[in-house]
Amino acid sequence: MSDLTFMSKFKPETRCIKEFKYWIVCIRAKCSTLGDAVILLKRETPTVAGILPEEAAEFPEVVKWYEDTCTKKFGAVKFNYVIMMMKDFFVHYHAFPRYDKEVEMFETTWKDKDWPGAVDFVGGTILDEDKLMEIKDYMKE
C-alpha cells in the first residue's frame, strides 16, 4: 500500500476490503446498509476533475467488483453512490448497497429503512471494530 496518510480517517491499513492499482475499497464504519464502503482514489487530488484518465478507466472495474461482491454475499438489489467531499478534500465515493428486504447476517437484522427512496448516508449506525472486521473479512473471501 502506498502512502495513504491523507485518507487516514478511513483507516485503510485495517479497513481495506480490496486494493486496486489506483483505488482502494474500505468498509465504512457508519453503516446505513449492510456492506457500506468508501471507494478512495489512492492519489490525493481535491476535485473529481483531477482524476487522471488511467484512474478513471479503472473505476468501472472497481465498481463491478464491489457490486458483484455485495450482490453475491448479501443479496443487494441496487446501489447508490455519493461524492460530496465537504469535510475530506480528496476524491472518494461513499457506496451503499440497497436491499428490498431484511437481511439476517452477523447476528444482526439489517433493514434498508429508506428503501426504495434515497439512502440516508448521514445517519446510520456506527459499528464496533470487531463487527466491521467480520464484515470486511467476509467480503474479502
Placement of each model-derived feature along the sequence:
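HIT superfamily nucleotide-processing domains
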Residues: 1-141
